[in-house]
Regions:
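Single conserved hydrophobic/aromatic residue that forms the stacking wall/gate
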Residues: 1-7, 11
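Glycine-centered flexibility sites
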Residues: 9, 27-28, 59-60
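Conserved strand-to-helix beginnings and helix N-cap segments that scaffold or border functional pockets
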Residues: 13-14, 93
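A short glycine-rich, Lys/Arg-flanked "PGG" loop and its adjoining helix->strand segment in the class I
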Residues: 14-27
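Conserved beta-strand signature within the Rossmann-like core of class I S-adenosyl-L-methionine
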Residues: 27-35
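Substrate-binding/catalytic lobe of Class I Rossmann-like enzymes that use SAM or dcSAM, i.e.
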Residues: 36-149
């Protein structure tokens, strides 16, 4: 990952949270669901490109919890509520893996090949392990735009 792409990631996050603030009326809230990467892993992660960034979500960049909160506050929003449920999401990914493979005949009839199957099996199982281990998390966060009073 280059310095310019890292700067682009910061800019995109700033634009995103600024737009949320712009769209909210004073005192109103927005709830987001965001996947985060551990703070301890953030510096290494942001400087590299992993399998998911290359093949599943090209150009994607997960925030860490502290980066997420920093951007929220920079945009002038406040965090009203937050819950994390990565371990539960791991079970969801394992279920998607089962359904995907149980429906493989239907999927392959649409023209998808074994390479596609292996790629998605790797994605689903590696993500399940990542959430189970706590290296990534899923956060639902409720943000509020300040009241004008």
């Amino acid at each position: 990952r280059t310095t310019s792409s890292a700067a682009s990631d910061v800019y995109k996050r700033q634009v995103y949270f600024d737009k949320i603030k712009q769209c909210l009326k004073p005192g109103k809230q927005a709830t987001l669901q965001i996947i985060t990467i551990q703070d301890a892993r953030w510096e290494v992660y942001r400087k590299s490109v992993d399998f998911i960034q290359k093949y599943i979500f090209p150009g994607g960049m997960l925030p860490s919890p502290s980066v997420l909160r920093k951007e929220v506050h920079r945009a002038g929003l406040s965090v009203q509520h937050s819950i994390e449920f990565g371990k539960s999401y791991s079970q969801t990914l394992r279920r998607w893996f089962e359904v995907f493979n149980n429906k493989w005949d239907t999927i392959s009839a649409m023209g998808f090949d074994d390479r596609f199957r292996r790629m998605w099996n790797f994605y689903l199982t590696s993500c399940a392990a990542t959430f189970e281990s706590g290296n990534c998390d899923v956060t639902q966060i409720t943000l509020q735009k300040p009241d004008n009073n």
